[in-house]
Amino acid sequence: VTICFISILTGLPAGSYGAGNDWMAQRFNVQNEPFPNLAWATCSWNMGAALFPLVFVPLTENTGRMPGYFVAYIIFELFLFGSAFADNFATLVVTRFFGGGASSVSINIVGGSISDVWKGDKARSLPMSLFGFTSVAGIALGPFIGSAIVQIGGPNTGLNASWRWIYYVQLIYNAALIPVFYLFLKETRGDVILKKRAKKLRKETGRPIYAESELNKPSVVRLLKVSFMRPTKMLLTEPVVIFFTLWISFAWGILFLFFSSVVQTFGTTYGFGILATGLIQLAITFGAVIGTVFNPFQDWLYLRTASKNQERPGHPIPEGRLYTSIPGSLLFTGGLFMYGWSSRPDVHWIVPTIGVCIVGVGIYSIYMGVVNYLTDAYEKYAASALSAASLGRNTFGAFLPQASYSLFNNLGFGWAGSLLGFIGAALSVVPAVLVLKGREIRARSPFMLESTFGGEDDEERKNNAGLTGVAGVAGGPPGAAGDYHV
């Protein structure tokens, strides 16, 4: 519960920023039409989220989860402070870049902690499902939190400006929770715990007792090299990674595009104010709740495939991870059409809101399908596959919102929604092809063939790979540790 709470808290600033657009445009003299220049701060947040984990998450494999949590969380707080007191727009863009990076590192470590504690597909199903929910909901809750704060904030002057209170409030409650996290969080990284025990025994007995990780520790340079090079190679040469990255990246880009387009469509069509549009965007979170409720059914379908696996009897097949993501992807597509064509004055506002909710169901379903499939199919290379997908996902989240104003203004709400829906429909083919032809596709992949575990240590090694692979759920790429502890 505590680590999932961290996932929500560190995701909130990503979505809450846009609630202060009107105030920031006046304060910084930044024009938001026809090009949404204020979206550069969202772009910088997501680019930080894409890049920072590649460098910093691998380091936690040696130092442990606890130092990583608190260093990342304190840096996150410091750059929230910088955003709150920014005196110009350039400062805001820069501080959000570092804040987004620290947020993503923190969330990645949350994913690692889950895999440290819960071993095996069945045991990890519920924690993974909840973590996937908090990863989406933390960002999706941001617009409502931000709009509620500016609605009751002070005048648009000086340090008491409404938009600054978005950061003040988050600074206060995040700082207040640091002691709580310190009390409840414990180190979960197994080899770090063993190193501490070995060190204690050496001190108490004087005997040369060492943990295996102390004797066979990869260098930081090697960790960082693999953390950058292998995901890049997979993103350029592995068709599954390429198409799954496009699939999840488009869905993630829509999540961030909605932060501006919902304000645009509901403000123009229904005359909704900032707080009302923030409430509308809660529909994405509600969609993620629905997806979470149905996720145990997906896990049940997946575990049943173990009896049909001829390649590795007794093990569920990777394609079993995608069964509900196919209808989920179609719901995502249908929700985009519904949102676009129902955003008209003669249609009640609840109809496009339902469309937003359906899109939220689809985003969650796609998200979980991609993460779980790549983890199963690539096993010991799961960390690198997820790094590639996460890099693309955050890059789309950075740049797709830049198209929001021109897309909906030039095409109109209906055709803009249709264009997005057609792209979503085309990408819905990806999981269907994998379910039908997955075995043949995996047989042609050098990475998948090499990564398949076997032998007496299969379960232990698979769990080790999952340790960093699951971290890809978080919102930034995991480290490369899964590529070493096998």
Predicted regions and their residues:
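Cytoplasmic helix-loop-helix junction between adjacent transmembrane helices
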Residues: 95-135
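Extracellular/periplasmic helix-loop-helix junction of adjacent transmembrane segments
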Residues: 20-50
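Glycine-rich segments within core transmembrane alpha-helices of 12-TM secondary carriers
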Residues: 123-154, 158-159, 168, 173-177, ...
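Intracellular terminal tails of multi-pass secondary transporters
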Residues: 1-10, 14, 18, 22, ...
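Structural signature of the two symmetry-related core transmembrane helices
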Residues: 67-81, 90, 288, 307-337
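Extracytoplasmic gate region of multi-pass secondary transporters
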Residues: 17-18, 226-292, 366-372
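Central cavity-lining transmembrane alpha-helices of secondary-active solute carriers
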Residues: 40-57, 282-295
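Helix-breaking motifs and short loop linkers at transmembrane-helix boundaries and internal kinks
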Residues: 13, 28-32, 63-64, 85-91, ...
